[in-house]
């Protein structure tokens, strides 16, 4: 199906996925409007670790999850937390999540994710060129470090998935590790380095570059909350009703991240979507502070330290608590002494506490494609931990759908009605 050339497209959501899609569609001649109650790039897109990794093929749920979850839930330093008051509402999603970790399913999911991630860097380069922002992407790679060979051996399953997907990675010894990152504690002796990865030291700056390019070319932005849709005589949505106005639309793209579930429901699609709430702390830069050259995952405590433009950022944790619960920074603050051990010289001065809502499906795959209910509705949400990384390739796939082009990436695995 091909939509009319130069049609009026309304995109709900001005995070990194919505912004990428807006600029991509606009570059192909479409009249694009963005609607979001929050400023562009200020929600989940704001606080990630800044990594764009070609080779993110390991789903969140893996075959050993059943054995690990009980210990994780009762370990105060664990990366996983569930708010027990939210469990009744979470249970259907959680059961699907655990089921997706079965060996055969996890292997299939990994293969399907690889069809997206293998193209993500190329797509980001094209998108950044549209915005004149290629300089924001730094080709420094993605590093995971471990204290010993036994800890590294524990990644065998992940590496097996990477091998079957043809992911480019290197096993590095202590000398190679500390050549890459001399500031990391010396008791880290082995690593896994993925060279095909870029780093964005200020994710918000990338969002703003895309938004600036979009508005300079005539794109329209309404900072308004979507309440409902108006439907035409043919049953298709023809306008978006917000808190301030009614905005006509020929074509709708739902790219509202964690807030997409209710919008999809109003448009006739029931989707299994919840939030993996993620936290970060930013630490002040000091003249004597540690040197870190790229985002680095520290095995064991399972957190990421990234050298952001405004200081070192600690990203950690998955909290399953929905959209309404207040943030709880207890766990991530408890990790600060560990982070200082991993990166000696790290300042203890916290300059920002942040929590964001990762829009997550139980099978770790985004929702990308045309609605089975309405031909003029497209979906682009549910990217979980990979919103930044998959934003540009998602935008290209949406543009291919609008243009009626063969993307060469099968979209059935990402359909909204797969659950």
Give residue ranges: language-model regions.
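Core beta-strand elements of the Rossmann-like FAD/NAD(P) dinucleotide-binding domain
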Residues: 5-7, 242-251
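Active-site substrate-recognition segment that forms the wall
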Residues: 50-51, 56, 60-100, 228-231, ...
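A conserved short coil-to-beta-strand element within the FAD-binding core of flavoproteins
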Residues: 172-176, 180, 222-238
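N-terminal Rossmann-like FAD-binding beta1-loop-alpha1 element of flavoenzymes
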Residues: 7-33
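Rossmann-like flavin
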Residues: 91-212
């Amino acid at each position: 199906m091909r939509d009319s050339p130069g049609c009026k497209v309304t995109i709900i959501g001005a995070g990194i996925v919505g912004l990428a899609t807006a600029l991509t569609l606009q570059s192909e001649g479409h009249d694009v409007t963005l609607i979001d109650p929050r400023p562009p790039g200020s929600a989940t897109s704001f606080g990630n670790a800044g990594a764009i990794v070609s080779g993110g093929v390991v789903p969140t749920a893996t075959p050993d999850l059943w054995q690990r979850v009980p210990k994780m839930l009762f370990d105060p330093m664990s990366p996983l937390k569930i708010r027990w008051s939210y469990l009744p509402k979470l249970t259907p999603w959680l059961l699907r999540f655990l089921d997706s970790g079965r060996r055969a399913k996890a292997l299939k999911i990994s293969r399907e994710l690889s069809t997206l991630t293998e193209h993500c860097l190329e797509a980001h380069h094209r998108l950044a060129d549209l915005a004149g922002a290629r300089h924001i992407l730094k080709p420094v790679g993605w590093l995971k470090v471990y204290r010993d060979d036994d800890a590294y051996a524990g990644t065998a399953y992940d590496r097996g998935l990477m091998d079957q997907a043809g992911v480019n990675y290197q096993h590095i010894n202590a000398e190679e590790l500390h050549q890459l990152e001399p500031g990391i504690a010396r008791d880290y002796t082995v690593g896994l380095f993925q060279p095909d990865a870029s780093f964005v030291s200020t994710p918000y700056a990338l969002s703003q570059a895309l938004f600036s390019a979009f508005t300079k070319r005539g794109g329209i932005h309404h900072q308004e909350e979507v309440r409902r849709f108006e439907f035409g005589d043919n049953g298709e949505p023809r306008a978006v009703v917000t808190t301030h106005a009614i905005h006509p639309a020929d074509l709708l793209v739902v790219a509202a991240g964690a807030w997409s579930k209710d919008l999809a429901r109003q448009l006739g699609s029931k989707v299994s979507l919840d939030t993996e709430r993620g936290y970060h702390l930013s630490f002040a830069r000091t003249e004597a502070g540690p040197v870190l050259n790229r985002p680095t995952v520290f095995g064991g405590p399972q957190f990421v330290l990234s050298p952001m433009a405004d200081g070192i950022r600690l990203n950690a944790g998955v909290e399953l608590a929905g959209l309404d619960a207040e943030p709880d920074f207890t766990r991530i603050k408890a990790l600060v002494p560990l982070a200082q051990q991993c990166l000696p010289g790290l300042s203890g001065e916290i300059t920002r506490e942040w929590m964001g809502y990762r829009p997550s499906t139980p099978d770790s795959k985004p929702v990308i494609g045309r609605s089975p209910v309405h031909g003029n509705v497209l979906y682009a949400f549910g990217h979980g931990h990979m919103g930044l990384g998959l934003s540009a390739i998602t935008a290209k796939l949406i543009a291919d759908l609008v243009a009626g082009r063969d993307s060469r990436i099968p979209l059935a695995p990402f359909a909204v009605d797969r659950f």
